[in-house]
Structure formats: C-alpha cells, structure tokens
Amino acid sequence: MESLYQHFTQLLTAYYQPQTKVVLAFSGGVDSRLLLALLSRYQRDHEIPCHAVYVHHGLSSNADDWAYKCQLWAKQAGISCDVEHVSLELNSGESIELLAREARYQALAKYIESGDLLLTGQHADDQLETFLLALKRGSGPKGLSCMAESTPFSAGTLVRPLLTTRREQIEAIAQSLQLEWVEDESNQDTRYDRNFLRHHVVPELFQRWPSIHQAVQRSASLCAQQETLLDELLNDVFYRALQADLSLDIAELASHSELARARLIRMWLAKQNAQMPTQVQLSLIWKEVALAQQDANPKLKLKQGEVRRFQNKLYWVCDKAEVSGWQVHIQVDCALVLPEGLGELMLSTTTKQATIALPPQPELLSVTFNPEGLTAHPVTRNHSRKLKKLFQEYHVPSWLRRQIPILMYQDQVVAVADLFVDKAFSGQDCELIWRKPL
C-alpha cells in the first residue's frame, strides 16, 4: 500500500495545479474504490479540494444501489460525490460498451474546469486487454499506444494512477484495507470482447508469460513514442497546410506522398478532437472529397461530424443542433455564452479597436443566427445586400452561414461577427468580439 500511495502522491504532485480540484470517476468497482481511499488520504495530507462523480447509465437494475453506496463511501472518506444520470441511444449494430464509455466521459467533462485533474481507475490488465483489442482490429501504432498515464481531457488532465498495477494487486490492497466495493454483473458476460479476453485469454497468457503485462506496457510506450516522433517530423508541414479557420489546404496536401498526406489528415482531425477515421474512410476523404469535381459540393459523413470541401480546403464540420431559432438579448461588456459550443460573444467598450456605435437603447440589442430575409450595408461596400449574398461574397461556407452570430438592433443588422459592421452603426463606442472554441 505504501509504495502505491507514494506513486499516487508523485503523480498528483506532478500534475496538480494550485486553485484547481481533483475529480474521481467513481463507479464503486474495486479500482475506483481503492482510488477513493488513496485520494482521501492525499486530501488529508495536502488539503486540496476533491470531488467524486458516479455516472448512472441505467443499464443495470443495481445501478441505484451502486449510486447510494458510492455516495455513502465518498461521505465516509470526506469527499463530496454527485450522481450524474445519462441515457444511451441504443442503435442496432452499435457497441453498448462504446456508447456507455462515450456517455460517461461526456458526463465527467462537465465537472472539469481549467487545470482540474480527472482520476480514472484503469490498470495494467485493462492496458493488456486494450492492446489485444487493438491487435484484433488491425490497429497501427496509434491504436497500439493504448492508454497513457496522463492525457489532456476537456479543460484539464486525465490521470490513471493504477495503470502499472495489476488487478490482483489492487484487490489484495483493497482487502487489506477492508474496503467494500460493487461487482458489476456485466463484467462476467463473455459475449463482450473485453470480458472474453479477461476471463479466457489473459489468464492463459499470464500463466505462460508472467511478464506479459510489462512487455505490453513497453510495446505500447514505444508505439506512443513513434507517434510523437512522426508528429514532430511533420509539424512544420502540418502548420503550412493548416489555415487560420482550422481548414486544411488541399494544394499543400497534394504536394506530399500518400503516406504523409494520410498522416497530415489524421493530425488535422486529431486537432479537431474528431474520432479517427478508418483506412477506407481516410482514402475516401482524399479521393471523393478533396479530389471531387470543382463544381461539386462533396462531403463524407464520419462519427460526430463530416469532412467537407470549400474553395480548395478541407473543413471538419461537427454535428450541431439547429440554432437559427435562437435569439437572446446581449448586454454591453457582459460575455454571452452561445449555444452548441459556438463560443462566447461580447460587446466590449474597453477595446482600442472599437468599430460600432451603440444605438439609443442598447438594452434592445440581441443576437441571432438566422440570416433569413435580412439585409445589411457593410462599411466597406457601396450599397446594401441580402445577407445570403454577402455571405457568398465574404466566402463563408454554406454550412457555416447559420452558425455565425448576427448582432441585431430591433429589426436592423448591426454587425455580423468576424465579417463586418453595418454602415448605419459604424462608430467607436465598442467592438463585437467573438471568442470561438479552440
């Protein structure tokens, strides 16, 4: 226990930043139960804010009981605990494991503010299973890198303190501490690939090769190093191809080999936090989107979004709900949070680049995303035009035209964020600042 706590302390000390908190993903299983005990001790020793979150998927009839136990154990450990309910949209052919995992991390992300740490309980056996599953899928070095001890997550960092510790060691320590934990009955169902490996494959591998966990950890680490090196070698090329609006220049891509091009597209999608495409999808991005006829409007649907082409550039378009019906009043010098992760908007009077004159009644200013039927007269133009035409003239891709904030004064367009100010509202009172998500 002491050596594990020492390792735990070293990890948290390395990653913890002052004025932040530590969040524990707490399922109540033996892994997170031991992490709760370690975190409770660390909190007493270092006096830092800690919080636990139980994600309730509703997949088991025991979930309510597990949630109750998790809150009880957390209270006994002196750590606050929330129960976060999620619902899964089960579609034919989709993995329940994958859907549950995605929903769990989306729920946990809501608790992570800038610099916070998220602790999860993956251990050495999980790493071995992940490696074998990646082999089964035919993954390359990226997939075989498996899980890192730490990785960026939401606005903070995800840390896996148990990643080099075997399951049987975790159980032995938990028993020595007389801890109770929950047993998820689904972990015995060998219809799931991971459970099949856990119960039928990994024990045989370990019996034959007792150092298999360390060997896999070493291979995963070497694969991760190769991935990092590839990114470093292509970094300059990547940033030549990457445009200010996060699109990717097709001409720059075309000047490189097929292998380098595929890697650059993967780097681009990774920067957008998109799920990695398959080899077939990667080929289609180039052949059917990038190289489509010039008069075509090509796109390729992937999970979470689609790749599109506009003016010889590739764009990643995230799936977003329709926002053109959204309209909210905006106050001067107060940040307005936009829907669907579209960022923040502010009318700032403290800027040195003021371009807008405030109207007689600023309280009537509002923000919309619907350009339908609106006209405007940009300061730099000789006459007014429909916003639809202006978007074309300003080379705004069609799919973005209902995701750009429009500042309104009653029924008049005051400004379109990042594009122009209407001539009737030109002045030096304030500036419209759109802080887009990274």
Feature-to-residue mapping (PLM):
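Short coil/loop linkers at secondary-structure junctions
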Residues: 49, 80, 180, 211, ...
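Core alpha/beta nucleotide-donor-binding catalytic domains of modification enzymes
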Residues: 1-203, 232
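AMP-forming adenylation/ATP pyrophosphatase catalytic core
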Residues: 5-30, 51, 86, 90, ...
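Internal, active-site/partner-interface "lid" segment
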Residues: 188-195, 213, 217-221
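Conserved anion/nucleotide-ligand pocket segment
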Residues: 199-200, 204-216
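Residue-level detector of well-ordered alpha-helical segments, enriched
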Residues: 127, 215, 260-264
